Amino acid sequence: MKRLFIDTGAWYAVVDKKDPDHRVAKHFLRNNKIPFLTTNFIFDETITLIRSRLGWRVARDFGERLKQSGFVSIIAVKDEDEERAWEIFLKYRDKDFSYTDCTSFAVMERLKIDMAFSFDSHFQIMKFQVVP
């Protein structure tokens, strides 16, 4: 079964009506029935970004909706994922990957997920299909 990994930039674009990708992101999320997943690291990064740009209340509301929605699984990054993430981080030092990016790649590899909802070109560098 196909599953879709959702990255921070996509979550943020869905929330922020002023984001240039807001309409595309919201439309894509509403019109796809593929199972969605993200990681606890992405959840952390997204909540932190929303709070810093849009405020605590918006971050809280988004977090509560996401946790209670049932349409997305939040996967915990495992120790083995962090080991693989560190390998990726060291190997691709010229690519400007964040450590969180690397944990996402590691989880996607482990779970055999090849598609990401992201506006970050780093996923393409790692040969994942990027949508929308």
Question: What is the predicted role of each segment?
Answer:
Residues M1, F105, E109-P132:
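Acidic, PIN/NYN-like endoribonuclease modules and their adjacent C-terminal/linker elements
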Residues M1-T38, R51-E64:
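Short, well-structured N-terminal submotif of metal-dependent ribonuclease cores
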Residues A25, F43, G63, E82, ...:
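Alpha-helical structural signal
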Residues N40-F41, D101, D120-S121:
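Short secondary-structure boundary segments
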Residues L66-K78, Y92-D94, F123-P132:
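Short acidic, glycine/proline-enriched helix-loop-strand junctions
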Residues S73-M115:
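Active-site neighborhoods of divalent-metal-dependent phosphate/nucleic-acid chemistry enzymes
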